[in-house]
Amino acid sequence: MFRQEQPLAEGSFAPMGSLQPEAGNASWNGTEAPGGGARATPYSLQVTLTLVCLAGLLMLFTVFGNVLVIIAVFTSRALKAPQNLFLVSLASADILVATLVIPFSLANEVMGYWYFGKAWCEIYLALDVLFCTSSIVHLCAISLDRYWSITQAIEYNLKRTPRRIKAIIVTVWVISAVISFPPLISIEKKAGGGGQQPAEPRCEINDQKWYVISSCIGSFFAPCLIMILVYVRIYQIAKRRTRVPPSRRGPDAAAALPGGAERRPNGLGPERGVGRVGAEAEPLPVQLNGAPGEPAPAGPRDADGLDLEESSSSEHAERPPGPRRSERGPRAKSKARASQVKPGDSLPRRGPGAPGPGAPATGAGEERGGVAKASRWRGRQNREKRFTFVLAVVIGVFVVCWFPFFFTYTLTAVGCSVPPTLFKFFFWFGYCNSSLNPVIYTIFNHDFRRAFKKILCRGDRKRIV
């Protein structure tokens, strides 16, 4: 795949031959001093300690943050949606980078040569490419998942099961392995240094131009292009739906309603049996003291459009409508009396038991149950939007972190010269991406923030939601 002429690649894609320093440069070709003394090191003691401390903090923060993400997804009810398994797999890849790749890249950097032998050199290079590639292929799969959940809301969400998501994750890792395996076929070991000096341990990998370019395209540029196009399309769909009034939206917009139900021409709710699979469509709320056709305001439990009992992107198939347990008995009767329509309301008065036009009669408790379910749906839709935004930020940060490295590496493949210091900076800047996703989740996602707080503050006995 990529050939490293320095003592060894510092990561996923080893530096090209164009970055090879001249022979005898101690920064890259330190050898035994005359008389069997110690090898020269690339950096001074102060610089070495600084690099070790910074890389150590990066590794600790990466492992800690991504372990929190995994625990949060498996323990928080608000994060148990099947598609969050993508985030678990992505976090696992970042943890593996911090534990199996960065430590050896750091040792190679500060020592100036490869110390760990031929076998681990092969494994190290393959794992480095594997984990980096899997990260971007994960993000590509996540972006496609978001696109399908928006454009095929009913059909796709019925198919979005944990088993299906796990199958996609396995496919992601297989694709990544296919990309990272070929370098093992052409890895060679060569001696460094010149003259009669003892050879320095080196680990070199395929540096053929066609392979370098094709690997960069397959590992970064092609998935990146797919993600950008998909999110542009998602943005266009969201913008179009925002501009079109609800009463004029077509079938695509209707798919965003609970169960894919369409609103009746009179604006009072959906027609039953429309767009449902195996269950009746559920009634949409009606504003009792406001403009007709507008949803009723959410209760205290649904403040900020957030239903704490539902997952961030839970399945869109609702339970059939019916009275809620909490509304049976005397309490339900008192609620029914309190919810009677008053003069001036947007709904016409009806006699007891008189069914509305085009819909069977419902009691006050059942009507309130429909309002609550529609409110939960609004909360779920709001979470879908926030989740899509968070993933867009994750993808954007990944591109910002890794694009400089892949761009400069592609330049080296076509013969352009890149300063070694700049090249190494871009590579380590890419490593930093592994630690940033937990920070992004904390800043932009309310559910992750609550889950992290619960995990870190065990004194709070409130249920994780």
From Swiss-Prot:
Cellular component, GO annotation: cytoplasm; dopaminergic synapse; plasma membrane; presynapse; receptor complex
InterPro entries for this protein: ADR_fam, ADRA2A_rcpt, GPCR_Rhodpsn, GPCR_Rhodpsn_7TM
SMART domains in UniProt: 7TM_GPCR_Srsx (SM01381)
Record-annotated membrane-spanning stretches: 49-74, 86-111, 122-144, 165-188, 208-232, 390-414, 425-445
Compartments, record wording: Cell membrane
Pfam families: 7tm_1 (PF00001)
GO molecular function, one term: thioesterase binding
Note, other: Alpha2-adrenergic receptor shows an allosteric modulation by Na(+), H(+) and amiloride analogs.
Protein name, UniProt field: Alpha-2A adrenergic receptor
Organism (species): Sus scrofa (Pig)
